[in-house]
Design a protein with these regions (language model features):
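Beta-rich accessory regions
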Residues: 1-228
Length: 229
């Protein structure tokens, strides 16, 4: 097998910030992603899973930038099912503290697409009693940012639906302080966007046409990337 997955992540800024654990590097998507927003859905002060799922029921999203701030529930697993992918909160992982000692902290995780490998976990401690989680979901890519970028992870994935829904292992209570779901448009121009944003398949017969399409779209892609900086 190859030593890489060919996954491409969205451009991010790395910043140094002083935290209770000392100086840390934060990773956060560049603001240019806002140029790709085509529709936004915002909700606040929801108190049950039923309420959250009702709010989400009308949203069908292919490309997603979702942010949620919620209050954890003791001894309960919270599952955010985004396009068929389970992102769970409520288990734990080990992470070094400011003294370098390994400590147990709450985690957020999702299954590794390679079945023989363990789930991908990152720390997700509470800040003032709440956890903030941001998910960027492309057609075959998932990026996760916790507490403003204090912790981050990325992996390739295979979404199976266009829906978003939540669940809790105990009861129906779920305090969601804020939830924002931004639907994203494709970076490709209309020729590709109408084909679900994917480039046409390359064959011996159409290789020349595909090459011309790439040349036609290259200035647009370069402009989009530069404007996102």
């Amino acid at each position: 097998g190859l030593p890489f997955t060919q996954q491409m992540t969205f451009p991010c800024e790395l910043t140094l910030r002083t935290t209770a654990e000392g100086v840390r590097i934060f990773r956060w998507p560049i603001d240019g992603i806002r140029k790709l927003y085509k529709k936004s859905h915002a909700f606040t002060d929801m108190t049950t899973v039923s309420e959250a799922n009702e709010a989400l029921s009308e949203i069908t999203a292919d490309l997603v930038d979702m942010s949620i701030t919620f209050k954890p529930i003791a001894d309960a697993i919270i599952t955010f099912k985004v396009r068929g992918l389970d992102i769970t909160y409520g288990n734990s992982t080990e992470f070094p503290n400011k003294d370098g000692d390994m400590v147990t902290v709450p985690s957020v995780e999702f299954d590794n697409i390679e079945d023989e490998k363990p789930a991908i976990k990152i720390p997700a401690p509470t800040v003032d009693g709440a956890v903030s989680l941001r998910l960027l979901l492309d057609r075959m890519s998932l990026e996760m940012f916790v507490n403003g970028g204090a912790y981050a992870a990325a992996s390739y994935c295979i979404p199976t639906t266009d829906r978003i829904e939540f669940s809790v292992s105990k009861g129906d209570v779920l305090q969601v302080d804020s939830l924002v779901v931004n639907e994203l448009r494709s970076i490709w121009k209309e020729e590709y966007a109408e084909n679900d944003g994917t480039a046409p398949e390359v064959t011996d017969l159409n290789a020349k046409d595909v090459s011309m399409q790439w040349e036609k779209n290259l200035p647009y892609l370069e402009e989009a990337y530069i404007s996102a900086q």
